UniProtKB/Swiss-Prot annotation:
InterPro entries (UniProt xref): NblA, NblA_sf
Disulfide bonds, paired cysteine numbers: none
Protein name: Phycobilisome degradation protein NblA
Pfam families according to UniProt: NblA (PF04485)
Gene: nblA
């Protein structure tokens, strides 16, 4: 059996920010949303690489 996952809940401030973003994307074209999505995925990958590099340096 897998160990329980830590709580990844958003803070109240993060929930508020998420709601603002949700409202903003309603006015964006599908093409622009696709571009933004790809950029978010790219940044997430870069973040993972930074995190992995920090772990390697600490080992």
């Amino acid at each position: 059996m897998l160990p329980p996952l830590p709580d990844f809940s958003l803070s109240v401030e993060q929930q508020f920010d998420l709601q603002k973003y949700r409202q903003q994307v309603r006015d964006i074209s599908r093409e622009d949303l696709e571009d933004l999505f790809i950029e978010v995925v790219r940044q997430k990958m870069a973040h993972e690489n930074i995190f992995k590099g920090m772990i390697r340096q600490g080992s």
